[in-house]
């Protein structure tokens, strides 16, 4: 499973990229708005930092306007992926983008049949939202597993991005259940590195080393 970071903050992206594990970036209008910067310029900045896919989301809800927006976003850099909501109009736009050779990430997926529809429309990626399903008492991992099984049975190459990741258990379970990618906030990426036994082990090694130096 590959790791993407879910942010529009350049410093967070650079820090994650320095770890050597970052394969891509996902953004959304809320994340960019939080940064208080020009949307297109920030996507361009991100694409200059990361070589992998960078998802940039359309704002419009009508297919023709989504297509116009997506074409402009795709011009920013070759690694831009146009992010489209899972709606009837979104599917129309995804088909058009597929015909144009523009990669897409269908977001706000909450059922396996939505993922299948997106894949058949030509989506490069589908993004089921784990945390938001958990919030309403549903099991997001069941959804990941269902999508992975359906795609495997039917030979579908669309990749599954586990989104709305809240903690390290989401990451582990997504990997076990067939997600190709997890897109993760910076704070969760930082938590993945840490384990109390690792810290204890380092402290013990250092303490033992200090003892040898005292002799």
From Swiss-Prot:
Places the protein is found: Cytoplasm
EC class name: transferase
Function: Transaldolase is important for the balance of metabolites in the pentose-phosphate pathway.
Organism of provenance: Bacillus anthracis
The EC number(s) this enzyme carries: 2.2.1.2
Pathway where this protein functions: Carbohydrate degradation; pentose phosphate pathway; D-glyceraldehyde 3-phosphate and beta-D-fructose 6-phosphate from D-ribose 5-phosphate and D-xylulose 5-phosphate (non-oxidative stage): step 2/3
Lineage: Bacteria, Bacillati, Bacillota, Bacilli, Bacillales
GO CC annotation: cytoplasm
Keyword vocabulary terms for this entry: Cytoplasm, Pentose shunt, Schiff base, Transferase
Keyword Transferase part of the UniProt annotation: yes
GO MF, any single term: transaldolase activity
Family: Belongs to the transaldolase family. Type 3B subfamily.
GO BP annotations, alphabetical order: carbohydrate metabolic process; pentose-phosphate shunt
Keyword Aminoacyl-tRNA synthetase: no
Designated name of the protein: Probable transaldolase 1
Record's catalysed reaction(s): D-sedoheptulose 7-phosphate + D-glyceraldehyde 3-phosphate = D-erythrose 4-phosphate + beta-D-fructose 6-phosphate
One Pfam assignment: TAL_FSA
Main subcellular location of this protein, as a coarse class: cytoplasm
Active site (record annotation): 83
């Amino acid at each position: 499973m590959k790791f993407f970071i879910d942010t529009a903050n350049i410093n967070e992206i650079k820090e994650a990229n320095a770890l050597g594990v970052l394969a891509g970036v996902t953004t959304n209008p809320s994340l960019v708005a939080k940064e208080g910067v020009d949307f297109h310029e920030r996507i361009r900045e991100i694409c200059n930092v990361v070589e992998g896919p960078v998802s940039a989301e359309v704002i419009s809800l009508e297919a023709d306007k989504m297509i116009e927006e997506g074409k402009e976003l795709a011009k920013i850099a070759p690694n831009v992926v146009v992010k489209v909501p899972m709606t009837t109009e979104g599917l129309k736009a995804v088909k058009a983008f597929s015909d144009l050779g523009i990669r897409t990430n269908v977001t706000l997926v909450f059922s396996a049949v939505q993922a299948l529809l997106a894949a058949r429309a030509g989506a490069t990626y589908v993004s089921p939202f784990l945390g938001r399903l958990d919030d309403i008492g549903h099991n997001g991992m069941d959804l990941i597993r269902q999508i992975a099984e359906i795609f495997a049975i039917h030979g579908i190459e669309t990749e599954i991005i586990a989104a709305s990741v809240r903690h390290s258990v989401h990451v582990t379970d997504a990997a076990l259940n067939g997600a190709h990618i997890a897109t993760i906030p910076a704070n969760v990426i930082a938590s993945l590195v840490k384990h109390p036994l690792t810290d204890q082990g380092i402290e013990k090694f250092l303490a033992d080393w200090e003892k040898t130096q005292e002799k």
